């Protein structure tokens, strides 16, 4: 199905997938979810497309997803882990995840609320903290493994309903990145070069 979505498109729409996923995983990481991650790895080999994985809500969930993808033969430099800003809170774990070669996606820009207690994440970092964490990663040489976005999936995310809208990163976050010491070259790497490389089929 993944291969068909890339090569033939979705139904009769003429629209083709540009990546594999987002593959949704939960915690505990179920066998069926692991099977889908393995299928994504196989589809990556055939299509050359990148894989995007949504990890479950556990500090080690992202690493477990990467282990399954790696064992299935995925090219980890073309695997993106979503929601790092809520899923991997310990700095050492972020570094270990980056060392695998995968891309860490900070995709909750503009969201500063809390997740329900059942997710066991009460404090969600604000944009300033997100940028601090990104700088920590770039300082260690992982600038080519960072994605950023805003996970605008509800009406409340849109400007007309009181949200930040789709311009938030360019309008608000980039100036803060510069204040916090990220060079224009680093910003261009994160915002232009990384997506361009990931969305180019290997």
Q: Which residues does each predicted region cover?
A:
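Active-site gating/metal-coordination segments in enzymes
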Residues: 1-46, 103, 110, 120
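Active-site beta-loop-alpha junctions enriched in small/polar residues
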Residues: 25, 56-58, 82-87, 109-111, ...
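Acidic (Asp/Glu)-rich catalytic clusters
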Residues: 5-15, 42-45, 70-74, 94-101, ...
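Active-site glycine- and acidic-residue-rich loops that bind
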Residues: 81-91, 111-135
């Amino acid at each position: 199905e993944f291969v068909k979505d890339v090569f033939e498109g979705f139904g009769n729409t003429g629209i083709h997938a540009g990546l594999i996923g987002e593959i949704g995983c939960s915690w505990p990481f179920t066998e069926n979810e692991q099977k889908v991650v393995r299928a994504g790895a196989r589809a990556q080999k055939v299509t050359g497309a990148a894989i995007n994985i949504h990890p479950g809500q556990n500090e080690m969930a992202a690493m477990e997803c990467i282990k399954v993808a790696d064992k299935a033969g995925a090219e980890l430099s073309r695997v993106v882990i979503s929601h790092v800003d809520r899923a991997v809170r310990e700095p050492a774990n972020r570094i270990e995840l980056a060392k695998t070669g995968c891309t860490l996606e900070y995709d909750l820009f503009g969201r500063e609320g809390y997740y329900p207690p059942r997710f066991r994440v009460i404090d969600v970092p604000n944009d300033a903290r997100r940028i601090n964490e990104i700088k920590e990663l770039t300082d260690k040489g992982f600038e080519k493994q960072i994605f950023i976005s805003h996970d605008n999936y509800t009406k409340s995310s849109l400007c007309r309903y009181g949200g930040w809208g789709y311009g938030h990163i360019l309008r608000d976050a980039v100036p803060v990145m510069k204040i916090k010491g990220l060079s224009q070259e680093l910003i261009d790497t994160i915002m232009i070069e990384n997506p361009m490389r990931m969305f180019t089929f290997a």
